[in-house]
Amino acid sequence: MEQIYTQIRQYIDENRQPMLKLWRDLVNTESGTLQIDGVNAVCSILRREMENAGIHTRVRAIQNSGDMLIGEWNPGSAKAPLLLIGHMDTVFKEGAVKENPFRVDENGMAHGPGVLDMKAGLVMALYTVKALDSVDWKERPIKFIFASDEENLHMRSDAKKIFA
């Protein structure tokens, strides 16, 4: 088991730059809850990355809100799936990226709208599966549900039902 952990750490270390680029791309995409085009742009970026990683995806259109992204990896496993949930919207108003674009300061701290809540988590979810795939771990399926309206308590979508 220690060998697998070592291989996973190595995968993460070797992929720091692509992870950082994806994080930058997500943070620099304006996606306040009411910025539907921006939320959908984040959805498109993630969908492309997920499909490239072998994760089957589908988009659920939500009226008056951004799209919801649903993904599934390793669907053939008989074991119960793990569920990774997150959201693609932020609390930031239009123009926040122009005022505060993604950057990493001299202390290694990242800054920008949504840098932690929750765009880092979206990158981590994707790269968790990519790292598991790199060591051929296929013990359980993993499902993803990325909502578009968490910052307003899913007032426009049925995410609460889907998460339940």
Protein language model regions, located:
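Acidic/His- and Gly-rich active-site-bordering loop/insert found
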Residues: 2-113, 134-138
